[in-house]
């Protein structure tokens, strides 16, 4: 031959070489068929035995790259590594049987016993670990790092699995990412899932578009879709429910079939099982809720005791904190409606607003401490400390401290700052009912566009007493007419 700088050790090694240079063949029949292929290294019996014109291949191990003919720039280290490769290039196989059935798949990297073992035409795959991606045939652009990672994947592409048995059972599911031991290990055909953490999304089979970050997050999910779980054990018990978001350790941890829930904060919506469309933001928000639906809770301990109550809104620390089964309440402010348990259709806006109400119905309060002692029904208070001590019902007070001294009275109307307190017209109202008070003792004038009309009917009066005002009083009257001339 005319080839230069070749090394051949072993029977038949480089036996057919003609003009090729810089080849090294060590072992019986190593590079035996090579004619013009250059810069190849074959160490081991039958290594690169079929190579003819391909160059820059490295094969170390019995039967490594044994079927290669024209594939270039391949590296095979280990018995039977890349054994079936024929024309594919740019593959790296390290380990017994790694990439051993690959024929035309290119740009693959396999490190570990039987890594990418069944690959035939799949390209740009990376498998690191014993049996990683070992069932892959035509799947492309997969990354499997860890023993048995993506172990049963066949034709699926664009998956990433990092960790022992991550995505182990995946067959045709694509675009999944699993980081952590046993993450997404039961996934078969589902796509577009992301799992980060030990056993995250571990039971998922066909559920898609899920994101799980944290140990055991979404661990038991099987067919639920479009869930997001961030934090240890977040959405741990979820099985078939979809469209849930849980951010925080143990948030939504017992949810099984409830859908459309959002929980942000440690143990938020912790006990929720089947309820849907709840929003909980804050430490322990809606923590004990089980079947109550359509609640919104923002603030530490807000709606923390709620179990079955629905359609409640609590915004503020400890807002509606004692509520259990009541529905259709709105509480905005720290401790607003804090003592409410079964009262419904209440609205409280302001710190400590209606904070003493436990079973009241249809009350509305806006302002600091408004209606704070209330346990009655259908009261309305607007202003700081308005109706703050009342336990009666159907009172209306507008103004700071209006009706402040009303305790058990009902059906009163008090308008203006301090109306109904000591010093206001008629004195303080405490237990009185059916009274109207306008303003306090500082009011000096009262204006109205039209004349007052006050009902007067003898049938509604009693205890008549004669007056000593006779005809002389009547004669002294000087009636006039007038027109308004507003200043």
Question: Model-derived features: where do they sit?
Answer:
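Glycine- and small/polar-enriched repetitive beta-structure motifs of secreted/surface proteins
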Residues: 1-457
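C-terminal intramolecular chaperone/autoprocessing and neck/assembly modules of extracellular spikes
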Residues: 433-487
